[in-house]
């Protein structure tokens, strides 16, 4: 009798253990619906704000250009007005950043990476208005900046805002919604949903906590952001370069050569960005007056440059289709490339609220097209199309500089709708990334974040040192 009872109890214990194992297995893939709902809200808000930011920047640019058109026949008014308008707009952006939210300067992507590791604050009530209005000023002034950095930072801050509004306390929700907003922001800037997802997984891989909950939330946010973008802007690719021809197998070695070139250019470009940042820091020394006046001078010069050589100013989206179509000579392409390198360094490294993705894409297009046109002359038997090298170059500089080849490949293919060029894109971006790494180049955003954290630690140490002894105990 005791034996039967013991056997029955043992069987019951085994059944309970199996049920518990099955229950845990089923719950392992159970995503809290609240987080998915919040991710959808974050994606929708980011899409709406991203579209509003794009329209606002275009409105400021059109107003500025319209004012210049009114005095186009009077040179003595045109040139001073071009400088003054752009200078004033730029000064608005610099002043707001320096006065109210220093973390809103630059692209903002390193700030999101730092926030994902709980190393940087997320003051959304300050960053959102400063980044939006400040970006309207600097981008509207015609400075060589992109809107993708602002939308990524805006998206991440919207994620934290939603978290605070709905009073969600868990660390998982805080991290997930921040990453969701950042991914939705990139998607809203470029109409590139897959690139937005890959950007979080690849570029922010050291900070992103990859699990089923977070990745589902990122997918949900990106979907909603993309839907909102396409409702307002349609489904056409953001950069119209037309359908380019395929790259024959016997020409693929040329794309590897192009990747090697960008593998050398990427680390040099990153080094120049950091050195220019140091130069500006030595100039203004943190004084707001000097910083704003310096920003106004850079903005005014961009306004003048926009009259002399329009292709050398602005984010570069209008330049890319023109350059990729082969409308410039090799010499002119290289001249514009050098001019835009200088203006990109001045605008981005000065701390203006604006991104560097779009300027890098334009630089890659210019150098890639120049290489393609030269290769077409040297190897006429291949019947090369320079535009295919322009597409490959767009992603290659980003791959070598940011060290995110997958994001660069997919982003360019989504933006141009030339998916047939995926093989030459892979070859070029992989070659650029490997050589940049071999040469000792560091990812741009990670390096900027490290410098920001070092500065933050130094400021905190100085504050603690200057504080009265009683306050430190």
Curated annotation (Swiss-Prot):
<feature type="topological domain" description="Cytoplasmic">
    <location>
        <begin position="282"/>
        <end position="287"/>
    </location>
</feature>
<keyword id="KW-0050">Antiport</keyword>
<feature type="topological domain" description="Periplasmic">
    <location>
        <begin position="233"/>
        <end position="252"/>
    </location>
</feature>
<protein>
    <recommendedName>
        <fullName>H(+)/Cl(-) exchange transporter ClcA</fullName>
    </recommendedName>
</protein>
<feature type="transmembrane region" description="Helical">
    <location>
        <begin position="148"/>
        <end position="166"/>
    </location>
</feature>
<feature type="binding site">
    <location>
        <position position="356"/>
    </location>
    <ligand>
        <name>chloride</name>
    </ligand>
</feature>
<feature type="transmembrane region" description="Helical">
    <location>
        <begin position="124"/>
        <end position="141"/>
    </location>
</feature>
<feature type="transmembrane region" description="Helical">
    <location>
        <begin position="288"/>
        <end position="309"/>
    </location>
</feature>
<feature type="topological domain" description="Cytoplasmic">
    <location>
        <begin position="1"/>
        <end position="32"/>
    </location>
</feature>
<feature type="intramembrane region" description="Helical">
    <location>
        <begin position="109"/>
        <end position="116"/>
    </location>
</feature>
<keyword id="KW-0997">Cell inner membrane</keyword>
<feature type="topological domain" description="Cytoplasmic">
    <location>
        <begin position="117"/>
        <end position="123"/>
    </location>
</feature>
<keyword id="KW-0406">Ion transport</keyword>
<feature type="topological domain" description="Cytoplasmic">
    <location>
        <begin position="439"/>
        <end position="473"/>
    </location>
</feature>
<dbReference type="InterPro" id="IPR023861">
    <property type="entry name" value="Cl-channel_ClcA"/>
</dbReference>
<feature type="binding site">
    <location>
        <position position="107"/>
    </location>
    <ligand>
        <name>chloride</name>
    </ligand>
</feature>
<keyword id="KW-1133">Transmembrane helix</keyword>
<feature type="short sequence motif" description="Selectivity filter part_1">
    <location>
        <begin position="106"/>
        <end position="110"/>
    </location>
</feature>
<feature type="topological domain" description="Periplasmic">
    <location>
        <begin position="310"/>
        <end position="329"/>
    </location>
</feature>
<feature type="binding site">
    <location>
        <position position="357"/>
    </location>
    <ligand>
        <name>chloride</name>
    </ligand>
</feature>
<feature type="transmembrane region" description="Helical">
    <location>
        <begin position="253"/>
        <end position="281"/>
    </location>
</feature>
<feature type="transmembrane region" description="Helical">
    <location>
        <begin position="33"/>
        <end position="69"/>
    </location>
</feature>
<feature type="binding site">
    <location>
        <position position="445"/>
    </location>
    <ligand>
        <name>chloride</name>
    </ligand>
</feature>
<keyword id="KW-0812">Transmembrane</keyword>
<feature type="intramembrane region" description="Helical">
    <location>
        <begin position="177"/>
        <end position="189"/>
    </location>
</feature>
<feature type="transmembrane region" description="Helical">
    <location>
        <begin position="330"/>
        <end position="349"/>
    </location>
</feature>
<dbReference type="Pfam" id="PF00654">
    <property type="entry name" value="Voltage_CLC"/>
</dbReference>
<feature type="intramembrane region" description="Helical">
    <location>
        <begin position="387"/>
        <end position="401"/>
    </location>
</feature>
<dbReference type="GO" id="GO:0005247">
    <property type="term" value="F:voltage-gated chloride channel activity"/>
</dbReference>
<keyword id="KW-1003">Cell membrane</keyword>
<feature type="intramembrane region" description="Helical">
    <location>
        <begin position="405"/>
        <end position="416"/>
    </location>
</feature>
<dbReference type="GO" id="GO:0005886">
    <property type="term" value="C:plasma membrane"/>
</dbReference>
<feature type="transmembrane region" description="Helical">
    <location>
        <begin position="355"/>
        <end position="376"/>
    </location>
</feature>
<feature type="intramembrane region" description="Note=Loop between two helices">
    <location>
        <begin position="417"/>
        <end position="421"/>
    </location>
</feature>
<feature type="topological domain" description="Cytoplasmic">
    <location>
        <begin position="202"/>
        <end position="214"/>
    </location>
</feature>
<feature type="intramembrane region" description="Note=Loop between two helices">
    <location>
        <begin position="402"/>
        <end position="404"/>
    </location>
</feature>
<feature type="site" description="Mediates proton transfer from the protein to the inner aqueous phase">
    <location>
        <position position="203"/>
    </location>
</feature>
<feature type="topological domain" description="Periplasmic">
    <location>
        <begin position="70"/>
        <end position="76"/>
    </location>
</feature>
<feature type="topological domain" description="Periplasmic">
    <location>
        <begin position="377"/>
        <end position="386"/>
    </location>
</feature>
<comment type="similarity">
    <text>Belongs to the chloride channel (TC 2.A.49) family. ClcA subfamily.</text>
</comment>
<comment type="subunit">
    <text>Homodimer.</text>
</comment>
<dbReference type="InterPro" id="IPR001807">
    <property type="entry name" value="ClC"/>
</dbReference>
């Amino acid at each position: 009798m005791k034996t039967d009872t013991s056997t029955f109890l043992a069987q019951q214990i085994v059944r309970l253990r199996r049920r518990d194992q099955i229950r845990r297995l089923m719950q392992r893939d159970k995503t809290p619906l609240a987080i998915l709902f919040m991710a959808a809200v974050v994606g929708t808000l980011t899409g709406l704000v991203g579209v509003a930011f794009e329209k606002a920047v275009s409105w400021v640019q059109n107003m500025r250009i319209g004012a210049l058109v009114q005095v186009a026949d009077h040179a003595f008014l045109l040139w001073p007005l071009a400088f003054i308008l752009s200078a004033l707009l730029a000064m608005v952006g610099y002043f707001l950043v320096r006065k109210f939210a220093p973390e809103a300067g630059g692209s903002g992507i390193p700030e999101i990476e730092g926030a994902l590791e709980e190393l940087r604050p997320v003051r959304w009530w300050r960053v959102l208005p400063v980044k939006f209005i400040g970006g309207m000023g600097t981008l509207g002034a015609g400075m060589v900046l992109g809107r993708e950095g602002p939308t990524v930072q805006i998206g991440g801050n919207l994620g934290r805002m939603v978290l605070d509004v709905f009073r969600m306390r868990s660390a998982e929700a805080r991290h997930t919604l921040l990453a969701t907003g950042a991914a939705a922001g990139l998607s809203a800037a470029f109409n590139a949903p897959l690139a937005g997802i890959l950007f979080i997984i690849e570029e922010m891989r050291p900070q992103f906590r990859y699990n089923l909950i977070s990745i589902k939330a990122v997918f949900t946010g990106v979907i909603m952001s993309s839907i909102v973008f396409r409702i307002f802007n349609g489904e056409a690719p953001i950069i119209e370069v037309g359908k380019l021809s395929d790259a024959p197998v016997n020409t693929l070695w040329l794309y590897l050569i192009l990747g090697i070139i960008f593998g050398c250019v990427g680390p040099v470009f990153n080094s120049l960005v950091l050195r220019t940042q140091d130069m500006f820091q030595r100039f203004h020394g943190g004084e707001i007056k000097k910083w704003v006046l310096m920003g106004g001078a850079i903005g005014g010069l961009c306004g003048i440059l926009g009259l002399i050589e329009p292709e050398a100013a602005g984010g570069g989206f209008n330049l890319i289709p023109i350059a990729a179509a082969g409308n410039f000579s090799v010499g002119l392409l290289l001249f514009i490339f050098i001019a835009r390198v200088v203006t990109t360094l001045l605008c981005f490294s000065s701390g203006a609220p604006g991104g560097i993705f779009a300027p890098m894409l334009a630089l890659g297009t210019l150098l890639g097209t120049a290489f393609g046109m030269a290769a077409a002359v040297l190897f006429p038997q291949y019947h090369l199309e320079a535009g295919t090298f322009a597409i490959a170059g767009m992603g290659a500089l980003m791959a070598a500089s940011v060290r995110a080849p997958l994001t660069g490949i997919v982003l360019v293919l989504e933006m141009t709708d030339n998916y047939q060029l995926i093989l030459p894109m892979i070859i070029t971006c992989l070659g650029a990334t490997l050589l940049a790494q071999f040469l000792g180049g560091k990812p741009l955003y990670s390096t900027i974040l490290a410098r920001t954290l070092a500065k933050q630690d130094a400021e905190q140490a100085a504050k603690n040192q200057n504080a009265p002894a009683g306050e430190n105990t």
